[in-house]
Design a protein with these regions (language model features):
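Long, compositionally biased charged/polar accessory segments in the mid-to-C-terminal portions
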Residues: 145-146, 248, 253-452
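Low-complexity, highly charged intrinsically disordered N-terminal segments
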Residues: 126-154
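Entry/capping segment at the start of metal-dependent catalytic domains
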Residues: 81-132
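Iron-sulfur cluster-binding cysteine motifs and their immediate structural context
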Residues: 29-97, 313
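Short, flexible loop segments at boundaries between secondary-structure elements
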Residues: 225-245, 356
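Glycine-rich phosphate-binding "P-loop"
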Residues: 161-185
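Tryptophan (W) side chains
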Residues: 8-11
């Protein structure tokens, strides 16, 4: 079997013996960031010491990679947790900022159209059907890009993300599936440019894409395609393993045998095992109460960009009703979707249920948790009943996605008010206040920047 080639940066290559002399693998210690709000360690190559320096300590940092670059002071301009300017970047990337008068743009950002879609033939190892990695694969097949900057699994831990440059279409197969954790994706921008890549595609989460767009004009690439995935909450790989252990303990399973996990839009978490078993757990049955208070770092609890509004195309699942959910945002996004041709089956997205009640209940729980009070937990006997009802009467399709965006907005206001009130006027965009206003959250003195 011939292993697909991934183009790892020169400082991250490792030769693997005579029969694999041309196979490029990550180093034994790929990228191992520590939890946000702590110091991120340097990259290492075995026997040669640090190659890229450690990220400097910052209170709110997801280690997107810019602080590991040769000009780390660019973080002041690039970081969405310092002084983001979404209207300006939306206008630069899409030709206009979001228009609250257009359907769903207040929630999802600028977009030309929203779709529910799936590949006709799902790709092996993909998280859903494989639209994201297939688009990137097509970019390489057609020669539209020289390389794709994305994440692959650590060879020693399938859940740990490792930043990679992929230069061969077949290499994208190794990048399918979900990772959980932090990896400095954008630290590879300078190596990509140094290797002569002029046309680049990037697959990233919102905090990475914001920094990429903020610096795009000075990066030196002739063409840049950005495929975004939504991101609701992230945590460290180590914390994620703790979560897997809690899930596995309920059925006396080995957490190391869990090969797949997904939070589905039908209010269930799906797990798959190495032996082929599939297990679906209702959200209400998850052992969330056993997680430590810092399981989700403050960066994720105060993020204002769930839908990745600065990508050319966003590929997620929240509005997909069991399929994938696409937001085609601009002309380049249309070009990316067109690469799939008749490989993809598109549908109009649906919407059902009401979101106000669930979001209001979520707000009450977030306020109690932020104040250190115990959550009001549902009686155990009632959980199976409500778990059965939620997929049938709760928000579904686009209404489910709207609810999740509003929950993230609510979470941002509540936690930032408590943990970083001095940041409110610079970190919270105007559209977030519009999202939370129906739930009684309005800015007080000093929480909103004066009009420009």
């Amino acid at each position: 079997m011939v292993r697909p080639r991934i183009r790892w940066p020169r400082w991250q290559r490792k030769r693997c013996g005579p029969r694999q002399a041309h196979t490029l693998l990550p180093c034994a210690l790929p990228l191992q960031p520590r939890p946000p709000t702590r110091d991120f360690p340097p990259f290492h190559r075995p026997g040669l010491g640090p190659i890229v320096g450690p990220a400097p300590h910052r209170d709110l940092c997801t280690d997107c990679g810019i602080s590991r670059s040769s000009a780390l002071k660019r973080c002041a301009k690039a970081c969405q947790f310092i002084r983001p300017d979404y209207p300006a970047l939306e206008a630069r990337v899409h030709g206009r900022a979001r228009d609250p008068q257009r359907a769903d743009e207040l929630h999802f950002g600028p977009h030309r159209r929203a779709l529910r879609a799936a590949l006709k033939a799902a790709l092996a190892g993909a998280q859903w059907t494989g639209i994201t990695t297939r688009v990137a694969e097509r970019l390489l097949e057609t020669g539209a890009v020289d390389a794709v900057l994305t994440m692959a699994p650590d060879p020693n831990d399938r859940w740990r993300p490792v930043s990679v440059l992929v230069t061969k279409p077949e290499g994208m197969a190794q990048c399918r599936g979900m990772r959980m954790g932090y990896a400095p994706l954008l630290a590879l921008l300078e190596p990509a440019r140094a290797q002569g890549h002029k046309h680049l595609a990037v697959i990233g989460i919102p905090c990475q894409v914001y920094a990429l767009r903020a610096l795009e004009a000075e990066l030196g690439f002739d063409k840049l395609y950005v495929i975004g995935t939504p991101c609701s909450d992230n945590t460290t790989t180590e914390r994620f393993h703790e979560f897997l252990a809690l899930l596995a303990a309920e059925t006396n399973d080995d957490p190391q045998r869990i090969s797949y996990l997904e939070f589905r839009a039908d209010y269930h978490v799906e797990m798959r095992y190495d032996d082929g078993r599939i297990r679906a757990v209702p959200f209400l049955q998850l052992p969330l109460s056993k997680l430590p208070a810092d399981f989700f770092p403050m960066t994720c609890r105060t993020c204002v960009d769930y839908t990745n509004v600065l990508a050319d195309i966003t590929v997620g699942y929240m509005g997909g009703e069991g399929e994938q959910w696409l937001l085609v945002r601009n002309e380049r996004g249309e070009e990316l979707l067109a690469l799939l041709g008749d490989e993809v089956v598109p549908h109009a997205p649906g919407s059902a249920g009401k979101r106000h009640g669930p979001v209001k209940g979520f707000l009450a729980n977030v306020q109690r948790a932020a104040g250190g009070l115990p959550l009001r937990r549902m009686p155990q006997w009632l959980r199976p009943i409500v778990g059965w009802l939620m997929p049938r009467i709760g928000p579904r399709g686009l209404e489910f996605a709207r609810a999740r965006v509003e929950m993230k907005a609510v979470e941002t206001i509540v936690h930032l008010r408590r943990e970083g009130p001095q940041r409110m006027k610079t970190m919270v965009p105007a559209h977030v206040w519009a999202l939370v206003e129906p739930y009684g959250l309005v800015p007080v003195a000093g929480e909103r920047a004066p009009p420009a």
